[in-house]
C-alpha cells in the first residue's frame, strides 16, 4: 500500500472536453483557406507553426488563435483577405467560451473523493491563465478542489515545485490525466504516482500504451479511479495493479 496525500488532476480532456472543439475550429479554418491549399497541407503547416510558437506563446486558445492567423498569412503567401482573417478570429473566440462541461462520471467521482476528507485535491493544468480559470469556474467543479495551479508547461521541475508548494513528497503525489507525455511521464520521472486515462482524440504517439511502470495505472473511464484508492485510507491499493 502507498499513501497518497495530494491528487493533481489535469483539466482539458480529463475533467471536460477540449480537443474536439479545437478540431472543429481547425476544420472550419481549413475550409476558409481552401482557396490557397488543401486541408492536409493547411493542417500540416499549422502544426509546424504552433510548434515554432510554443517557446514564445506557450499553450492555450489565444496562442492557437495567433498561430492560425500567422499560418493563414504564410500559406496564402500574404494573399488572405481581411474578411477571412476576421472569420478566423471569430471562430477562434468560441474556444474562449467553452462550457467546461464535465465528462460522465467526473462529478460523482470527485464528490466521492472529496467527501472522504482524506485528500487534498487540485487542478494542475497548463495554458493561458484567464482561459483556464474561466473554464474551471464554468465547469461547476470548484467545490471539489482545494486549489487550481496553472503553469506554462508540465515538466518534472513543475511537478517538483508543486510538491514543494503543497508540502508533500513525490511518492505522496498522484497525477491524473489524459496525456502520457504531459500528465504522466513527468510525475513518474520524479517518483510520483500516475493514473492515465487515455484520450484517443489527441495527437500523441500511441506507443505510450505499451509502457509499463510500477507507479502507473491505466484506466478507460474516470469513474474507475476510486477502484484504486483504498476506501478507508489515503492509500493506493497496489494489489489491484496486476
What are these regions (language model features)?
Residues 28, 32, 36, 109-118:
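A short, Lys/Arg-enriched amphipathic alpha-helix followed by its capping loop at the start of a domain
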Residues 88-108:
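Long amphipathic N-terminal alpha/beta scaffold segment
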Residues 1-45:
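Active-site neighborhood of HAD-like aspartate-dependent phosphohydrolases
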Residues 49-94:
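A metal-dependent, Asp-based hydrolase signature
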Residues 22-30, 65, 69, 129:
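An amphipathic alpha-helix signature
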Residues 1-4, 107, 111, 115, ...:
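Asp-based, Mg2+/Mn2+-dependent phosphohydrolase catalytic module
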Residues 25-29, 46, 50, 88-93, ...:
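Hydrophobic alpha-helical core bundles mediating ligand binding, dimerization, or RNAP-core interactions
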Amino acid at each position: 500500500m502507498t499513501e497518497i496525500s495530494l491528487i493533481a488532476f489535469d483539466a482539458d480532456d480529463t475533467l471536460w472536453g477540449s480537443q474536439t472543439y479545437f478540431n472543429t475550429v481547425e476544420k472550419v479554418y481549413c475550409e476558409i483557406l481552401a482557396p490557397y491549399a488543401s486541408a492536409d497541407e493547411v493542417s500540416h503547416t499549422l502544426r509546424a507553426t504552433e510548434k515554432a510558437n510554443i517557446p514564445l506563446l506557450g499553450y492555450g486558445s489565444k496562442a492557437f488563435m495567433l498561430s492560425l492567423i500567422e499560418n493563414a498569412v504564410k500559406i496564402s503567401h500574404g494573399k488572405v483577405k481581411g474578411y477571412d482573417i476576421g472569420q478566423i478570429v471569430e471562430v477562434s473566440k468560441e474556444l474562449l467560451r467553452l462550457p467546461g462541461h464535465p465528462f460522465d462520471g467526473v462529478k460523482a467521482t470527485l464528490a466521492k473523493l472529496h467527501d472522504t476528507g482524506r485528500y487534498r485535491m487540485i487542478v494542475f493544468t497548463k495554458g493561458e491563465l484567464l482561459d483556464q480559470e474561466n473554464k474551471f469556474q464554468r465547469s461547476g467543479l470548484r467545490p471539489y478542489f482545494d486549489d487550481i495551479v496553472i503553469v506554462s508547461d508540465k515538466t518534472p521541475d513543475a511537478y517538483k515545485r508543486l510538491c514543494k508548494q503543497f508540502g508533500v513528497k513525490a511518492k505522496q503525489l498522484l497525477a491524473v490525466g489524459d496525456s502520457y507525455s504531459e500528465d504522466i511521464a513527468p510525475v513518474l520521472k520524479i517518483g510520483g504516482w500516475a493514473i492515465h486515462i487515455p484520450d484517443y482524440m489527441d495527437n500523441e504517439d500511441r506507443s505510450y500504451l505499451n509502457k509499463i511502470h510500477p507507479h502507473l495505472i491505466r484506466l478507460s473511464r474516470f469513474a474507475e479511479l476510486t477502484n484504486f484508492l483504498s476506501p478507508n485510507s489515503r492509500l493506493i491499493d497496489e494489489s489491484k495493479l496486476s
